[in-house]
């Protein structure tokens, strides 16, 4: 099954955070928070403006983005946990 977001929504797959500190201490799953960065795997057509025009999104598939801890709606597709959110919930793109 594939999910196609509508309008200005994007689908993000969370990226795993480091589970070991710089000093070598392993952080258990119970002490870690959900990662607030992820890779965009699908984007909608764009934001519909008041005059009816459609503005293309500033992000694209493959971008790694930062987003708020409580952004979007979590969904499960084919056993994978994904987050569907509006482009406005994205704080920035991580450039390599």
UniProtKB/Swiss-Prot annotation:
Gene Ontology CC entries for this record: cytoplasm
Keywords: Chaperone, Cytoplasm, Stress response
GO molecular function, one term: unfolded protein binding
Identification of the protein by name: Co-chaperonin GroES
Family matches, as HAMAP family: CH10
Recorded name of the encoding gene: groES
Pfam families the UniProt entry points to: Cpn10
Domain of life (superkingdom): Bacteria
Keyword Chaperone: yes
Compartments, record wording: Cytoplasm
Disulfide pattern: none
């Amino acid at each position: 099954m594939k999910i196609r977001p509508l309008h200005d929504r994007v689908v993000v797959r969370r990226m795993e955070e480091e589970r070991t500190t710089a000093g070598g201490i392993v952080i258990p799953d119970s002490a870690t928070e959900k990662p607030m960065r992820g890779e965009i795997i699908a984007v909608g057509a764009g934001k519909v403006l008041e005059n009816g025009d459609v503005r293309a999104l500033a992000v694209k598939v493959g971008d790694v983005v930062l987003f708020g801890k409580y952004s979007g709606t979590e969904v499960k597709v084919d056993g994978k946990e994904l987050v569907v959110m509006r482009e406005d919930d994205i704080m920035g793109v991580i450039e390599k």
